[in-house]
Amino acid sequence: MLASRMPDAVSLTWGLPSFQTPEYIRNGIIRVLQQDKDAGKYTLPDGLPDLRQQVVETHLNRTGIEVNADANVMIAAGNMQGLNTLFHTMMDPGDEVILTDPCFASHIQQIQLFNGEPVYWPLNDDWSLDIERLPELVTDKTQAVVIVSPSNPTGKIFSEAELRCVGEIARQNDFFVIIDDPYSDFVYDNNSSYFNLASVGELADHLIYLYSFSKSYAMSGWRLSYMILPEELKYEAMKVHDATMICAPRISQLAGLIALTEPSDHKQRFRTVLSDRRDLICQRLDTCSHVFDYRKPDGAYYLFPRIRTPHHNAKTFAIDLLQNSAVAVTPGSAFGPSGEHHVRMAFCVDEATINSAFDRIEAYFSNRC
């Protein structure tokens, strides 16, 4: 909010890619608007049948797991709305959801909105999962654990072995693993490092998978995602979804159907650009080693550097940086207790923005030395 009142500020805060929705989707939706007389109407609460059936095929291609369009697929207005529906469905006051620490800040807020308790699961120093710690956090009030891989805010990709352990602990203790997946199409260096726990069929009764169109298709403003979930849970979640949302916007669902069915190489192009931006921001951070140290992210488009220079806390550091160099970063404390003394930087912005931000950061801290 402070940055919005500074018109000359350079922002590395918002995880909003600089890409435009691909042309084939834009042109396709123009055709639909001209030809489909129902394009402005409601759909069924769980989404267009054609889109849900295409999700079945897409999920099979991505995971090797076959699901049922009517029993297991639900279309949401973005992963955040999908998660909001899930938490509303599964939580009573005082119930607990385990979050990696650091985690996506909105997950904390959503759980608290329903008078639930976020239970923080601190990551190891290299941002990997501390599997031995997880069983100690499970209680009779545990409803779920939320996993984002590649991670927001760290960019870490959790290993197959780690994720399988999480799934087994959830199965043994009868709670859900919720996979929030906005970033799996943005994996750098080693594509084989990414593992989707939704590909483990024996976990189907304890697993909820949410895939967002926002990042991979540059459709953040369209508000669209899909959920794969057990039939009984879908039945209950539909009651909440219908009462609060009715349905995801039909026009967005039609765009999603185009996105999934027509061939395009845009994901590879996006990934190449983001990989170059990751390299650039890491190079610029290397020149600021007296201010930050960091781990190079495996995926997504965030870094989570630790603040080395003297400071009180992450929030005051971020405010000071904004007020004195007109560069906006997100305080790490927003992402959980372990985020303190870190900041999040998004490298989904263009190269000129990255360079401008670090020119200012370097100038500010050189003047302080």
For each predicted feature, which ranges?
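Structural signature of PLP-dependent enzymes
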Residues: 237-241, 260-282
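Conserved PLP-anchoring active-site segment centered on the Schiff-base-forming lysine
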Residues: 89-111
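N-terminal small-domain helix-loop-helix segment of the aminotransferase-like
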Residues: 1-77, 85, 259-262, 368-369
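Active-site PLP attachment segment
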Residues: 199-236, 248-251
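PLP-dependent enzyme catalytic core of the Aspartate aminotransferase-like
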Residues: 313, 320-329, 335-369
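Conserved glycine-rich beta-strand-loop-beta hairpin in the small C-terminal domain of fold type I
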Residues: 257, 273-282, 294-307
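Active-site phosphate-binding strand-loop segment of PLP-dependent enzymes
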Residues: 125-192
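A short helix-loop-beta submotif of the ANL/AMP-binding
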Residues: 112-119
